[in-house]
Design a protein with these regions (language model features):
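Membrane-interface interhelical connector segments
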Residues: 39-70
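N-terminal membrane topogenic signal
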Residues: 3-16, 157-160
Length: 163
């Protein structure tokens, strides 16, 4: 597209895309119980899905029970996922600087890229400590692997603006 041939437009589009994805990813942590109420019948034990992926279905059942019982007995546990969402939104807002002045705020983009890379060792260390199955850890790591792509492309375009 002609519009994205301008490096400044490309940088802004990539960063806004990243910011929206980051914010939506975080916001999905708030209605966790509601989301699991929808997922369990579709993908939990007894669903058609469970015939092909029984381990994932069993995990969905376990997470559903954990959230339902945990939030039921200790509703303050949900406060942790509320803060997780807040953290995602706060980090997304930090990218307003690079959207406005990409060259001056290149460091924010590079910081975001570092965080995307750090998702992988963080997951590999803490996932097993918390009993998280490997397939779920792959999902968690994918956020860093996917998130780094628009940031890397934005960084390349910012460097084009500098030169």
């Amino acid at each position: 597209m002609k519009m994205f041939s301008d490096p400044m437009v490309r940088v802004r589009a990539l960063l806004i895309f990243f910011m929206i994805g980051l914010a939506l990813s975080g916001l999905s942590a708030v209605p966790l119980q509601w989301e699991l109420d929808i997922l369990k019948p579709l993908f939990g034990s007894g669903s058609q899905f469970s015939r092909f992926f029984p381990a994932i279905s069993s995990w969905i059942d376990q997470v559903y029970q954990g959230v339902k019982n945990g939030y039921g007995l200790y509703p303050f546990l949900a406060y942790g996922t509320d803060w997780l969402a807040f953290g995602h939104i706060a980090i997304a807002l930090a990218f307003i600087g690079p959207v406005r002045e990409p060259i001056k705020n290149l460091w924010v983009v590079e910081f975001g890229m570092i965080i995307c890379v750090l998702v992988i060792p963080w997951t590999l260390v803490f996932g097993p400590l918390r009993g998280i199955p490997f397939f779920h850890m792959l999902l968690d790591m994918s956020f860093g692997m996917v998130g780094i792509i628009p940031l890397w492309l934005a960084r390349r375009s910012i460097l084009d603006l500098i030169s």
